[in-house]
């Protein structure tokens, strides 16, 4: 008779979880940051708020963002005036948009990832779908299963309302699934659409205005599995270790609430300070077992909540400016796409590493870290090992 331990051993993969493919997608509507304040105050009928517009212009100028992509066009906003007001009842209108657009954009990214992976989609065993943009039942995971034509018995995980740290969360979950289910191939999708958070400006809630200056739309998809099939599946990064922690004394630092007016966004404390104060501890826990204490010797993928977070992390750890190059590039070209951001940065890094003729997918280095920061304040840490190019 076979023992339980023998069954468990047979169920487990041998090698670490690997990222085998990455695909990204954005809406076609591109918004230039330099002209966005004019558009935003005009479309929200707020041009009379001259001082507030000047504040918003300064926020946009300091954001280090050149452009963003948004589902919400001028035409859509004119058809939905309640979305343009500050805190007007508008949840129905927003939901009607995102329950369609979130899985649609997710599909676009997933198709690219599946194509790069090179295997038939029938070999996908698990699906993780993550969004902070709206809620529905059955969820966006179900809708994507239908849109892609996946098998009905794919094991699905739907993550709603996690926020900006969730790019790390989906990797942590995918790692556990891949390593504990021999032969598993996990499709991971993060899809974010700002139609839930867009609203007009308010003199009394400048934290809401910060969100209007930073957030953009995007979807990213990965294929994750252990023990890649030689000559067929090509690993990009290996996931070695993961952790999640709530930063001490950070309650209320970042909040989001789904209300009749959509998803409200609140920054209540010194978020960059909290992140930079706690990052050292997270790094020691992650890299001490590897005997790594020089954080300039590893590659960096950090959720770009905004330039202030990146600046303070660099200063706290004494990082060289080039360490955050891929992170800052994605922030500049796409804005803050919440959970999808770090997956875009993974894609940016492996592509630029190959273009530069470097020896590994991680800017020529062997070890790296991926950080997600978000509501809680929650910090996700993923230790990555690069792959030879």
UniProtKB/Swiss-Prot annotation:
<comment type="function">
    <text>The primary product of this enzyme is 4,2',4',6'-tetrahydroxychalcone (also termed naringenin-chalcone or chalcone) which can under specific conditions spontaneously isomerize into naringenin.</text>
</comment>
<dbReference type="GO" id="GO:0016210">
    <property type="term" value="F:naringenin-chalcone synthase activity"/>
</dbReference>
<comment type="pathway">
    <text>Secondary metabolite biosynthesis; flavonoid biosynthesis.</text>
</comment>
<feature type="active site">
    <location>
        <position position="164"/>
    </location>
</feature>
<dbReference type="InterPro" id="IPR018088">
    <property type="entry name" value="Chalcone/stilbene_synthase_AS"/>
</dbReference>
<dbReference type="InterPro" id="IPR012328">
    <property type="entry name" value="Chalcone/stilbene_synt_C"/>
</dbReference>
<dbReference type="GO" id="GO:0030639">
    <property type="term" value="P:polyketide biosynthetic process"/>
</dbReference>
<keyword id="KW-0808">Transferase</keyword>
<keyword id="KW-0012">Acyltransferase</keyword>
<dbReference type="Pfam" id="PF00195">
    <property type="entry name" value="Chal_sti_synt_N"/>
</dbReference>
<dbReference type="InterPro" id="IPR016039">
    <property type="entry name" value="Thiolase-like"/>
</dbReference>
<comment type="similarity">
    <text>Belongs to the thiolase-like superfamily. Chalcone/stilbene synthases family.</text>
</comment>
<dbReference type="Pfam" id="PF02797">
    <property type="entry name" value="Chal_sti_synt_C"/>
</dbReference>
<dbReference type="InterPro" id="IPR001099">
    <property type="entry name" value="Chalcone/stilbene_synt_N"/>
</dbReference>
<dbReference type="InterPro" id="IPR011141">
    <property type="entry name" value="Polyketide_synthase_type-III"/>
</dbReference>
<protein>
    <recommendedName>
        <fullName>Chalcone synthase 4-1</fullName>
        <ecNumber>2.3.1.74</ecNumber>
    </recommendedName>
</protein>
<keyword id="KW-0284">Flavonoid biosynthesis</keyword>
<dbReference type="GO" id="GO:0009813">
    <property type="term" value="P:flavonoid biosynthetic process"/>
</dbReference>
């Amino acid at each position: 008779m076979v023992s339980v331990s023998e069954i468990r051993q047979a169920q487990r993969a041998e090698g670490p979880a690997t990222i085998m493919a990455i695909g990204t997608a954005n809406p076609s509507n591109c918004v230039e940051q330099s002209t966005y304040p004019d558009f935003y105050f005009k479309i929200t009928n707020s041009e009379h708020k001259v001082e507030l517009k000047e504040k918003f212009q300064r926020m946009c100028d300091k954001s280090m963002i050149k452009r963003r992509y948004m589902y919400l066009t001028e035409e859509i906003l004119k058809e939905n005036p309640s979305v343009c007001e500050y805190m007007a009842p508008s949840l129905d209108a927003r939901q009607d948009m995102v329950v369609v657009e979130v899985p649609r954009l997710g599909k676009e990214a997933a198709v690219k990832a599946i194509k790069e992976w090179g295997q038939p989609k029938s070999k996908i065993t698990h699906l993780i779908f993550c969004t902070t943009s709206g809620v529905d039942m059955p969820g966006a995971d179900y809708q994507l299963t239908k849109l892609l034509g996946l098998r009905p018995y794919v094991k699905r995980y739907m993550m709603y309302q996690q926020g900006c740290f969730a790019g790390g969360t989906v990797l942590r979950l995918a790692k556990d699934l891949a390593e504990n289910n021999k032969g598993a191939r996990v499709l991971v999708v993060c899809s974010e659409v700002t139609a839930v958070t867009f609203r007009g400006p308010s003199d009394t809630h400048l934290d809401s205005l910060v969100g209007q200056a930073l957030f953009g739309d995007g979807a990213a998809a990965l294929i994750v599995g252990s023990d890649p099939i030689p000559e067929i599946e090509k690993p990009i990064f290996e996931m070695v270790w993961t952790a999640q922690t709530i930063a001490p004394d950070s309650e209320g630092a970042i909040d989001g609430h789904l209300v009749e007016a959509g998803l409200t966004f609140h920054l209540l404390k010194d978020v960059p300070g909290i992140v930079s104060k706690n990052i050292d501890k997270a790094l020691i826990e992650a890299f001490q077992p590897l005997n790594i204490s020089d954080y300039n010797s590893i590659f960096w993928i950090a959720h770009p909540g905004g330039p202030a977070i990146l600046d303070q992390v660099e200063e706290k750890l004494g990082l060289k400016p080039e360490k955050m190059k891929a992170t800052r590039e994605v922030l500049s070209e796409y804005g803050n796409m919440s959970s999808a951001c770090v997956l875009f940065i993974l894609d940016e890094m492996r592509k630029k590493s190959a273009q530069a003729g470097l020896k590994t997918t991680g800017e020529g280095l062997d070890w790296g870290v991926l950080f997600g920061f978000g509501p809680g304040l929650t910090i996700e840490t993923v230790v990555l090992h690069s792959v030879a190019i």
